[in-house]
């Protein structure tokens, strides 16, 4: 059984520097108010069997320009700054739930600035759902654990990237994290918080999960709309009625007792990011941050042939990863 402190504070650093074949990373997506700057910063720790190749890093993804950088640091430059919350340091940069203070001078690139996060929309936790994985959060030795730090928040501040000024006044952000030994063999992930309704955020992921001697599909879909969460998960009894996947389009329908969700994601320009395999950052993750997502949420009426429309909206600046090896559909 995993420790209560770790389970009850999933946003904080879950590992320790003595682990082997272990990774942990926080995905910080930020979009400027004018939507011209679309970035992701991913502080990561990668612990291998061979300590000499273990390291920490900051992966930077410019979704508009298609630029990916992997800034590597010695393990001694990693510091966990809180046992209860997401707050870490890599080199001279600090990442937390309150924002990012960036000071990167690596690989011929310079990124400096401070971004402040406010109005965070946090996952609603309880004893049965300490994190987005629900009761599965208590299971030891899972290949990958997944968490959401903030579904949606306001981003303010200025970043200078190689001298270019990027202003994030009234921007929008999203933070999630993964930790474990490796990314799944197959997965699909998508997210957007840029809908016509500013108080709407959506994320969906499905992955092939090894459990005991089986390989199962596990999925998670969360909508935050006007202050309310709608959750569809494999552990809550929701069912995927339809899942169509090709290299650029994903369509699915999910249903539980009260709601039906229909979604279609169309992939934008995509680029290759590093992903973990047994703690080694040698895997691949092909991601777009300029994709589009159409969602429709219906409530099932007492009359089984009647439905009430709750949401019908179109998301832009969407993150999308289609990494299926014909295992999911």
Q: Language-model segments: which ranges?
A:
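Structured soluble/peripheral alpha/beta segments that form catalytic or ligand/cofactor-binding pockets
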Residues: 1-329
């Amino acid at each position: 059984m995993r420790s209560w402190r770790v389970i009850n504070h999933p946003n904080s650093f879950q590992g320790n520097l003595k682990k082997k074949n272990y990774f942990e990373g926080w995905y910080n997506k930020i979009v400027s108010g004018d939507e011209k700057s679309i970035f992701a910063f991913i502080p990561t720790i990668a612990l291998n069997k061979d300590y000499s190749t273990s390291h920490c890093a900051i992966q930077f993804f410019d979704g508009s320009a298609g630029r990916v950088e992997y800034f590597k640091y010695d393990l001694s430059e990693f510091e966990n700054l809180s046992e209860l919350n997401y707050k870490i340091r890599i080199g001279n940069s600090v990442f937390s739930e309150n924002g990012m203070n960036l000071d990167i001078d690596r690989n011929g690139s310079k990124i400096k600035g401070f971004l402040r996060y406010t109005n965070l929309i946090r996952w609603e936790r309880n004893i049965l759902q300490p994190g987005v994985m629900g009761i599965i959060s208590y299971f030891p030795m899972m290949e990958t654990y997944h968490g959401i730090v903030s579904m949606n928040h306001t981003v303010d501040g200025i970043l200078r990237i190689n001298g270019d000024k990027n202003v994030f006044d009234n921007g929008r952000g999203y933070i999630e994290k993964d930790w474990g030994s490796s990314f799944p063999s197959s997965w699909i992930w998508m997210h957007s918080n840029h809908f016509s309704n500013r108080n709407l955020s959506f994320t969906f992921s499905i992955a092939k999960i090894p459990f005991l001697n089986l390989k199962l599909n596990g999925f998670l879909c969360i909508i935050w709309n006007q202050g309310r969460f709608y959750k569809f998960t494999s552990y809550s009894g929701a069912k995927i009625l339809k899942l169509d996947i090709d290299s650029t389009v994903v369509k699915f329908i999910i249903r539980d007792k009260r709601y039906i969700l229909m979604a279609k994601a169309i992939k934008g320009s995509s680029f290759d990011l590093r992903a973990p395999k047994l703690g080694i950052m040698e895997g691949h993750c092909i991601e777009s941050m300029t994709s589009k997502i159409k969602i429709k949420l219906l409530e099932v009426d007492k009359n089984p042939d009647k439905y009430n429309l709750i949401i019908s909206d179109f998301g832009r600046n969407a993150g999308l990863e289609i990494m299926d090896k014909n295992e999911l559909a």
